[in-house]
A protein has these predicted regions:
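Conserved active-site tyrosine of GNAT-family acetyltransferases
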Residues: 20-25, 86, 113
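Vicinal oxygen chelate
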Residues: 1-3, 88-121
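Mid-chain, well-packed structural core segment of small domains
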Residues: 65-88
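Conserved short beta-strand elements that form part of the metal-binding/catalytic scaffold
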Residues: 31-66, 115-120
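N-terminal beta-strand motif that seeds the catalytic metal site of vicinal oxygen chelate
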Residues: 1-21, 70-72
């Protein structure tokens, strides 16, 4: 079997759909791609992320107890520019608590509490 990743799915509460779409579409600058007709009624959005896609899904019953270290790592060309953009959008920067030689990074959380690692690519 030859496996590869097509998409990553993150979930947010239905009440945070607009905030999450703003976060991924405006703050992160991802391009929204059309969802197939059978998926459009479910809400959320799909975004192109290089050769992969990020699928934003809506799910009730998510709360603060769902916060964890699970994350997706996004590489950026300039860590300083990314940090500035997040700060300007009011997103809290979570410093790297376990620095790794040769790997500069920080973390943020989307409106639904999903953790994102932002690393210099």
């Amino acid at each position: 079997m030859n496996a590869s990743i097509h998409h990553v799915n993150v979930t947010v509460p239905k009440s945070l759909e607009d905030a999450a779409k703003h976060f991924y579409g405006v703050v992160m600058g991802l391009t929204e791609v059309p969802k197939p007709p059978e998926s459009r009624g479910r809400g959320g959005a799909w975004y192109q992320l290089g050769d992969l896609q990020l699928h934003l899904s809506l799910e009730d019953g998510l709360g603060a107890d769902c916060i964890s270290k699970r994350h997706v790592c996004y590489t950026v060309s300039s860590l300083a520019e990314a940090e500035q953009k997040f700060r300007e959008a009011g997103v809290e920067i979570i410093p790297d608590d376990m620095p790794t030689a040769g790997w500069s990074r920080f973390y943020v959380r989307d409106p639904g509490g999903n953790r994102l690692e932002i690393a210099q690519g």
